[in-house]
Amino acid sequence: MMRVKKTSRKRAASHPSRIPKVELHQHVDGSIPVALAWKLMKRHRLNPVETVIQMEKLLVLQDQERGSLLRYLDKFHYPLWITQFYENIARVVEAIVEEAYQNQVRLLELRYSPVIHTYAGLTLRQTISAALSGINRAKKRFPVQAGLIVIAMRQHGPHIAKILARSAVAEGQQFHERTGVIGFDVAGLERGNSPKLFKEAYSIARIGGLGLTIHAGEDEGPHAIWQAIDDLGVTRIGHGCSSVGDKVLLRRLARDKILVECCITSNYQTGAVKPDRPHPIFTFLEYGIPVAICTDNTTVSGTNQTLENRRLVHKLTVPQLTMIHQNARNYSFIRTD
């Protein structure tokens, strides 16, 4: 259990940038650097506006758009125009890894939904291969551990999720000398798409040796997290904000050492956490629940790992932040053997 206490903002604020960081929850499509997105838009003559400044407003959540997960997810619309081509996918992934490394990220798990990158003719396996290629290019340039988590979108249904799970297993890290797929996730709007619907897909992923995580408790109640734990057997929860309303669930997360991937900036932007409420990460720490400090989408949220850590220094010391990152490394799906 980590005791949360106040510390001097002035003393701590200059140091989080130096912490070696672990990023366990970052989406490819929501993290493409604006300058690169604009360059690729122009190259393919797809730019919907005339200037990069106008483009930035379409890619980055604006103040008046805060408070809605739907408005937040709408920011993924334009990046999909350029990530339908193999080389573009590899290029944006390489750039994302580079940007993370510049923010002292030394272990990075990117996540990505292959289905929504097949509209121009790429197969599922080709879209996965393109993302892995981008990671491998970056790893040649920077000393960083990195891997790919495959996402199934809830709105595509359980059958597509099973197909994706099989494709992810086929590209698993155990079959690659370099980078492979390390995990499986389900994301998208939760309501009407309960975790138990995807039980077969998670069974395929588990048998195939993939790590298991899921987006749960972001726009749905604690029952979604209970299902994810009991029916799917996940070892990590993405967001998990609604669990603070269920003390029994909090104790279960602590007992089973299930890590919560906390995305502070994103959770306030989507309305998962109300503006006047403290972020659940502090409750998780008080209960002894493992956590990871995550960006979710660096471009959409206008954030990075350094900024996320700086948001926490009013209650956590730099040694505590360092310990969180060190412990998060133990929950990574990347194999080191």
What annotation goes with each model-predicted range?
Residues 3-210, 219-227, 231-236, 242-259, ...:
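Metal-cofactor-binding active-site regions of metalloenzymes
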